[in-house]
C-alpha cells in the first residue's frame, strides 16, 4: 500500500529522508523527490554501516537538490511556503490551479481558504477583481473531493444575477477538472424540464439564482438537508429586499449544521444585517476596507446638463476614448475562416475584447434600449443586456462583447456585480449611481488583475449630492475645475466640464437624428418617462450633502474645463463658458407681478402683495444666512466628511473622540474637528478613562454606504428608523422576515369594498394567487403547477431517492443526465418511406407520409416529391386530362359570366 502524502505539504526548507527508506516506492504522486532524479551511485555504492560522514553527505545532497531552481527540474515544481501548496490541497486541485495560471494566492484567498477548510462560517470582503470566487470555490472542491454515491446535493452557491452564476459555473468547471464532481446551473429563462433532469441526476454542486432555485425546490419538493456548504455571492445584494421572500424560504429549508459563507466587495462591518443567514460564530475578513476601488483605476467626473447627456456621451466615445466606428477589425475574417469540422461553443472561444471595450451603465432597461439604438445609429458595434431580456439573447449579447465582436456593452446594474470581462478598458456611468457601493461595483469591471482602466461619469446638477456622498465614502479629495495643477485621477475625485465645441457639435447631430429616426425619438420618450419614475424611487442623498452640493454647483470650478484635457485653456473660450454659466444661472430679482412697476411708478395690487411678502421673507433669509456664516467661521478647518456627519449625534461623539486620540492617524482623514469650538462640551471627558459606544475609527459615511437595507439613504428616514425601534411580542413566530413588524397592516380596497392586507402590495402578490411556504412566506402558486409530475410520467421515472440513500444503477437519478458542457442533439430531418399497401399499418404510414409532404421534410423539402416546384410538361398534360374527366363525369354545364 503506498504511503500517504504529508498534509500540509512540506515547505521548501524541509527535507524528507523517508523516501530513501522505501526504495520500492515512488513519490511522484506525493510530490517528493524520487531517487531516480539524481545520481547517487558515487555516494551509495557499498556504504559502510554506521558511517556518519555518509549520512551527512546524503542529507547535504538532498538539501542541495531541494534548493535548486524549478527550471532545472524537468516536470517538477518547487513548492514554495505560503502558496497553494502549503494549504494542504490535493494534487488534482493543485494541477487545476496551476493550469488556471494561479501561482500565489491573493490576500483574500490567503486569509479565507484556511478558515473555510477549518469549517468556520466566514464573511469576506475584498475589492473587486481580487479573486473572491476562487476563494470559496477552491476549498469547496477540496472538501467535496469526488462525486457521492448517496443522493443529495452537498454544495449550494447563490448568485443575484444569471451572468454571475454562469461565470461562477465556468470557474467551478475549471477547478474541478480531473474529478468526477457533478455541477449544474439553475437560472431563470432556461427550460424547467431540463432542470428537473439536472436535479434528478444527483448533482454535487448547485449554482443558482434565488428565484429559480426556490421554484424547483417547491415544484420538486426538494430536501435540502444534505447541503453542507452554502455560499452567498454578492451577499449584500442577495439580502436586500428584492430577494427577501426567496431567501427566507430557502434558509428555512437548509440544515442548521451547514457552513455559510458570505462574499462581496461591499459589506458593512456590523453583521446584524446578515442575521437571517444563520451564521454561527463567523469570522469577518475585511480586506482593502480603506481602499474601496482598485489603485489602477483612474476616474473622471464630467459636469453636464440634462439636455446634453447624449452629446456628452458621444463626445467621450469619439474624442476621449477614440472609439472606432463599425465592427472591430478581424471579426468578419475570423467568422469566414471557421472550420465546419471542428465546432466550438461559446465557452470554447479565447475571449479577447478589444482595447476599446467599454461598458455603459444606465438606470433602467428603457435607457438601455434607447442608448443601444442611438449608438448603433451612430455607427458603433453595440451589445446590450438588461434583466428582463430573454436568457438566450442575454448570453448571445454578452458573448459577442467577450469575443470582441462588439466594442460597447450597454447594461443596467444587472451586470455591475461579479462579471469578469478580460482587458476591459473603460466604464461610463451615463446615469450617476444613487449609492456609493453601486459605483464601486460598476467601476470594478475594469482595472482588474493589475490592468489599468478608466471610468467616466456624467454628473448633472441634481446628481451633485450623490457625488459628494461618493467622495465621503471613498475618502478622497474633491478637486473641482482647474484649482489644482496635475491632479491624480486615481487618488482624487476630479470634477470638471467637457469641451464646449465638440459637445455642441454632437448635440446638434443628436437633435438631427431625432428628427430623422422615428424609432429613436419614440424610445427617447419612453426613457424620459422611465427616468421620472426612477428619480422618484431612488434613494435620497444625505441632507448635508444636498446643502454642500448647492455651493459646489454654484462654484466657478464646476463649469471650468476638466484637467483631463490639459491646462492650455483659451482665455476667450473660458470667458465664453463663464458667460454661458452666468446666463444659465441667472435669477431675476423681481417676480412677474412686479415687472414694469419701477418705470411706471404705479403699483398694482399684485405688486403690493409681493412687496408685503418680501418684507416678511427678507429678514428671515438674512438671519439664516448669518447663522450659516457663523457656523462656517467656527469650523473653517472642518473637512467635508465631518460637515456631512455633523447632523447626527453619533458622528459628533466620534469627532470628539478623534480629538483625544492622537495615535489613529488613518481616521484623521475622515473625522476631524476644531477643538476650540467644542471646548466647553468636552472638558468633562477624561481622555484616559472615557469610553465611547462607537469605535474611534468609525466612519459614518462609509458604514451608511455599505449598509444592506439603507444603502445610501438618509439615516433620518422615518420608515427605517421606525423599523429599528419597533418591538412586537405577539405572534412573533409569524413574522415574514427579520426586522419587520408582525402586526397586520390593512388598506381599503375599492373593488372589493373591504379592508385587505397590505402585505399583498409589498410582496408582489397583488392580483396573483399565492400560497404559504414552509417558512410562512408567501410564494407564487405557480411554483406548484404539477409540471414535475408530468415530466416524471413523460420520462417514465418513479419516485426520487431519499436524501442519503444509495443511488443504484437503473434508478431514476441514475437514468437522468447532467449537462456535460457539449450537448449533442439529433437534428437530422428525414421523411418516412412510402407506405406499403400490403402492410397492416398502411393508413398510419400513409398519414405520416402526407404530414411529411405537407411540412416539406426530407425529400419533400422542394415540393411534391420532386426537386423543383414547377410542373413539367407531362405533369401539366396529365392534370388537364384528369380535370376533363372530372368535368365529363359531373355532367354539369359551366357557369356563364
From Swiss-Prot:
InterPro entries the UniProt entry points to: DBP10_C, DDX54/DBP10_DEAD-box_helicase, DEAD/DEAH_box_helicase_dom, DEAD_box_RNA_helicase, Helicase_ATP-bd, Helicase_C-like, P-loop_NTPase, RNA-helicase_DEAD-box_CS
Domain Helicase C-terminal: from-to ranges: 333-492
Short motif (DEAD box): ranges: 233-236
UniProt GO BP: rRNA processing
Domain of life of the source: Eukaryota
UniProt-annotated stretches for the region Disordered: 1-36, 327-356, 730-770, 800-838, 851-897
Biased composition (Basic residues): 886-897
Pfam families in alphabetical order: DBP10CT (PF08147), DEAD (PF00270), Helicase_C (PF00271)
UniProt domain Helicase ATP-binding: residue ranges: 113-285
Main location: nucleus
GO cellular component terms, semicolon-separated: cytosol; nucleolus
Compositionally biased tracts (Basic and acidic residues): 756-766, 829-838, 851-885
Catalysis performed (reactions): ATP + H2O = ADP + phosphate + H(+)
Protein family: Belongs to the DEAD box helicase family. DDX54/DBP10 subfamily.
Function: ATP-binding RNA helicase involved in the biogenesis of 60S ribosomal subunits and is required for the normal formation of 25S and 5.8S rRNAs.
Name of the molecule in the record: ATP-dependent RNA helicase DBP10
Natural source organism: Gibberella zeae (strain ATCC MYA-4620 / CBS 123657 / FGSC 9075 / NRRL 31084 / PH-1) (Wheat head blight fungus)
Gene: DBP10
Amino acid at each position: 500500500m503506498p504511503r500517504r502524502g504529508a498534509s500540509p505539504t512540506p515547505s521548501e526548507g524541509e527535507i524528507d529522508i523517508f523516501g530513501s527508506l522505501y526504495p520500492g516506492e515512488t513519490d511522484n504522486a506525493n510530490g517528493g523527490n524520487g531517487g531516480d532524479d539524481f545520481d547517487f551511485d558515487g555516494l551509495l555504492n557499498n556504504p559502510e554501516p554506521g558511517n556518519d560522514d555518509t549520512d551527512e553527505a546524503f542529507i547535504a545532497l538532498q538539501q542541495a537538490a531541494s534548493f535548486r531552481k524549478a527550471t532545472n527540474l524537468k516536470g517538477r515544481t518547487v513548492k514554495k511556503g505560503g502558496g497553494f501548496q502549503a494549504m494542504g490541497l490535493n494534487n488534482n486541485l493543485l494541477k487545476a490551479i496551476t493550469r488556471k495560471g494561479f501561482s500565489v494566492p491573493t490576500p483574500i484567498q490567503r486569509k479565507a481558504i484556511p478558515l473555510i477548510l477549518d469549517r468556520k462560517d466566514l464573511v469576506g470582503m475584498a475589492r473587486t477583481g481580487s479573486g473572491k470566487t476562487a476563494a470559496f470555490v477552491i476549498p469547496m472542491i477540496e472538501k467535496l473531493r469526488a462525486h457521492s454515491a448517496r443522493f443529495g446535493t452537498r454544495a449550494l452557491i447563490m448568485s443575484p444575477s444569471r451572468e454571475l452564476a454562469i461565470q461562477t459555473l465556468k470557474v467551478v468547471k475549471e477547478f474541478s477538472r480531473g474529478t468526477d464532481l457533478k455541477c449544474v446551473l439553475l437560472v431563470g429563462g432556461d427550460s424547467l424540464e431540463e432542470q428537473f433532469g439536472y436535479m434528478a441526476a444527483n448533482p454535487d454542486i448547485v449554482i443558482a439564482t434565488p428565484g429559480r432555485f426556490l421554484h424547483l425546490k417547491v415544484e420538486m419538493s426538494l430536501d435540502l438537508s444534505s447541503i453542507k456548504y452554502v455560499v452567498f455571492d454578492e451577499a449584500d445584494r442577495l439580502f436586500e429586499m428584492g430577494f427577501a421572500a426567496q431567501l427566507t424560504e430557502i434558509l428555512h429549508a437548509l440544515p442548521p449544521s451547514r457552513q455559510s459563507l458570505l462574499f462581496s466587495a461591499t459589506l458593512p462591518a456590523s453583521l446584524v444585517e446578515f442575521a437571517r443567514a444563520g451564521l454561527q460564530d463567523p469570522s469577518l475578513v475585511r480586506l482593502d476596507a480603506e481602499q474601496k476601488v482598485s489603485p489602477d483605476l483612474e476616474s473622471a467626473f464630467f459636469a453636464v446638463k440634462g439636455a446634453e447627456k447624449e452629446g456628452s456621451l458621444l463626445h467621450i466615445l469619439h474624442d476621449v476614448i477614440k472609439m472606432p466606428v463599425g465592427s472591430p477589425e478581424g471579426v468578419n475574417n475570423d467568422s469566414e475562416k471557421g472550420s465546419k469540422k471542428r465546432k466550438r461553443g461559446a465557452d470554447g472561444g479565447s475571449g479577447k475584447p478589444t482595447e476599446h471595450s467599454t461598458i455603459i451603465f444606465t438606470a433602467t432597461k428603457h435607457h438601455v434600449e434607447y442608448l443601444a439604438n442611438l449608438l448603433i445609429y451612430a455607427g458603433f458595434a453595440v451589445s446590450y443586456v438588461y434583466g428582463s431580456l430573454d436568457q438566450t439573447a442575454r448570453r448571445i449579447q454578452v458573448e459577442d462583447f467577450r469575443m470582441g465582436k462588439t466594442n460597447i456593452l450597454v447594461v443596467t446594474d444587472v451586470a455591475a456585480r461579479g462579471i469578469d470581462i478580460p482587458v476591459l478598458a473603460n466604464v461610463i456611468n451615463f446615469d450617476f449611481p444613487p449609492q456609493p457601493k453601486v459605483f464601486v461595483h460598476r467601476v470594478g469591471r475594469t482595472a482588474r488583475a493589475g490592468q489599468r482602466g478608466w471610468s467616466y461619469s456624467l454628473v448633472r446638477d441634481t446628481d451633485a449630492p450623490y457625488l459628494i456622498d461618493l467622495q465621503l465614502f471613498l475618502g478622497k479629495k474633491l478637486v473641482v475645475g482647474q484649482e489644482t495643477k496635475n491632479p491624480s485621477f486615481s487618488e482624487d475625485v476630479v470634477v470638471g466640464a467637457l469641451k464646449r465645441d465638440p459637445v455642441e457639435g454632437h448635440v446638434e447631430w443628436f437633435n438631427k437624428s431625432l428628427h430623422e429616426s422615428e424609432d429613436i425619438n419614440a424610445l427617447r420618450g419612453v426613457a424620459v418617462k422611465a427616468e421620472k419614475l426612477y428619480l422618484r424611487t431612488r434613494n435620497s442623498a444625505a441632507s448635508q450633502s444636498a446643502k454642500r452640493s448647492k455651493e459646489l454647483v454654484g462654484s466657478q470650478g464646476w463649469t471650468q474645463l476638466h484637467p483631463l484635457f490639459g491646462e492650455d485653456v483659451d482665455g476667450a473660450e473660458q470667458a465664453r463658458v463663464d458667460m454661458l454659466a452666468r446666463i444659465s444661472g441667472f435669477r431675476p430679482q423681481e417676480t412677474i407681478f412686479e415687472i414694469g412697476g419701477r418705470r411706471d411708478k404705479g403699483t398694482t395690487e399684485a405688486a403690493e402683495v409681493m412687496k408685503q411678502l418680501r418684507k416678511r421673507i427678507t429678514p428671515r433669509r438674512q438671519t439664516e444666512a448669518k447663522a450659516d456664516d457663523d457656523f462656517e467661521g467656527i469650523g473653517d478647518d472642518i473637512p467635508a466628511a465631518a460637515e456631512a456627519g455633523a447632523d447626527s449625534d453619533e458622528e459628533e461623539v466620534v469627532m470628539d473622540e478623534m480629538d483625544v486620540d492622537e495615535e489613529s492617524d488613518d481616521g484623521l482623514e475622515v473625522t476631524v474637528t476644531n477643538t476650540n469650538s467644542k471646548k466647553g462640551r468636552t472638558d468633562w471627558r477624561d481622555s484616559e478613562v472615557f469610553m465611547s459606544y462607537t469605535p474611534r475609527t468609525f466612519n459614518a459615511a462609509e458604514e451608511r454606504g455599505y449598509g444592506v437595507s439603507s444603502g445610501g439613504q438618509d439615516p433620518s428616514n422615518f420608515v427605517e428608523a421606525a423599523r429599528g425601534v419597533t418591538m412586537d411580542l405577539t405572534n412573533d413566530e409569524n413574522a415574514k422576515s427579520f426586522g419587520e413588524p408582525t402586526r397586520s397592516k390593512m388598506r381599503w380596497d375599492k373593488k372589493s369594498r373591504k379592508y385587505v392586507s397590505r402585505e399583498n402590495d409589498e410582496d408582489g402578490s397583488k392580483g396573483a394567487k399565492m400560497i404559504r411556504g414552509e417558512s410562512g412566506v408567501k410564494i407564487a402558486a405557480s411554483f406548484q403547477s404539477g409540471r414535475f409530475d408530468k415530466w416524471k410520467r413523460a420520462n417514465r421515472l418513479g419516485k426520487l431517492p431519499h436524501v442519503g440513500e444509495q443511488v443504484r444503477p437503473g434508478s431514476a437519478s441514475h437514468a437522468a443526465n447532467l449537462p456535460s458542457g457539449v450537448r449533442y442533439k439529433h437534428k437530422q430531418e428525414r421523411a418516412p418511406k412510402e407506405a406499403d399497401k400490403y402492410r397492416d399499418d398502411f393508413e398510419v404510414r400513409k398519414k405520416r407520409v402526407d404530414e411529411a409532404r405537407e411540412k416539406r421534410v426530407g425529400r419533400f423539402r422542394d415540393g411534391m416529391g420532386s426537386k423543383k416546384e414547377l410542373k413539367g410538361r407531362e405533369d401539366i398534360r396529365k392534370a388537364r386530362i384528369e380535370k376533363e374527366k372530372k368535368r365529363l363525369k359531373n355532367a354539369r354545364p359551366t357557369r356563364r359570366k
